[in-house]
Structures are given as C-alpha cells and as structure tokens.
Regions:
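Mixed-charge (Asp/Glu-Lys/Arg
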Residues: 1-34, 39-144
Length: 144
C-alpha cells in the first residue's frame, strides 16, 4: 500500500468494498471531488462515501480532514461515511470520527481489512486499535 499512488490506493479501497459485497462501487476521486474518493452501497443497502488518504505513516489525519468528510457525507446524502488511510488519526480527529459516526479505518485496521476482515466488521472496532502506550511508542520510534 505504501508504494501505491493516490489513484491506485483509491482503486484498492474500491476493490476491497466490492470483495465485501458492496454494490454500485465507483472510484470518483480527483481534484474537486467534493471529498469523495469512492462511493457506493454497503451490503445492507445503505449509501456510503469514502475518503481515502495515502499518507506517509509519520503524518496523522487531522480533525479538519474528518470534518471535511462529514461535509461530503451531507453533500452526497450518504448514510455512512468512511475514512480510510495508510496512517493514523490524531486524537482530536479520532474523537471527531467516533462522535459523528465516521468509520475511521487507520493503518492497522486497513491491514485487517486487506487480510479478509469485512468492512462492516470494522465498525465494531471504530475508535480503537491505535494501540496502547507501548505500541504507540514503538510506532513513533519506527516512523518518526
């Protein structure tokens, strides 16, 4: 994933959605995409909008980026907003996502999704899994 460019990463996320039974999945990401890189329907029929960010693991997703996705959710009248990234969320961004029902798929959860966990199952761990203090320290020493 770290070697993909932005378009390849969006295609990768769209393919994972299709694998999990999502329908009407299309990659729409481009400049001026109104914050939607992938759109479609979950297996239960709810509409979704996905923002994909392929960042260096040293960079964190900001609160503003999550708020932008919330605006996209309203703009596209999507029932579910999903933020998928190759990095992690800042504390305020993670809290904003959880408080507003955004499914926050960070680097660790993306690995689980890629290894076969279904997208709907990731909602159960939303806001978790960025690790305990020791894990965060190890990650910080590795990537920063």
């Amino acid at each position: 994933m770290d070697l993909m460019d932005g378009t390849q990463f969006e295609d990768f996320v769209a393919d994972l959605c299709r694998r999990d039974g999502c329908t009407e999945v299309r990659r729409v990401g481009r400049t001026g995409d109104d914050g939607a890189d992938v759109r479609g329907r979950l297996p239960d029929g709810r509409t979704m909008v996905i923002q994909c960010k392929r960042y260096n693991p040293k960079r964190k997703i900001s609160n503003g980026e999550v708020r932008n996705l919330l605006g996209s959710q309203v703009h596209f009248k999507a029932e579910v907003a999903v933020f998928v990234t190759t990095t992690y969320f800042s504390g305020p961004a993670e809290r904003c996502a959880v408080q507003n029902g955004v499914v926050a798929v960070h680097r660790d959860h993306l690995g689980l999704w890629n290894n076969g966990a279904a997208l709907p199952s990731l909602t159960a761990v939303n806001g978790a899994g960025q690790g305990d203090r020791r894990h965060r320290s190890l990650r910080r020493n590795t990537y920063e």
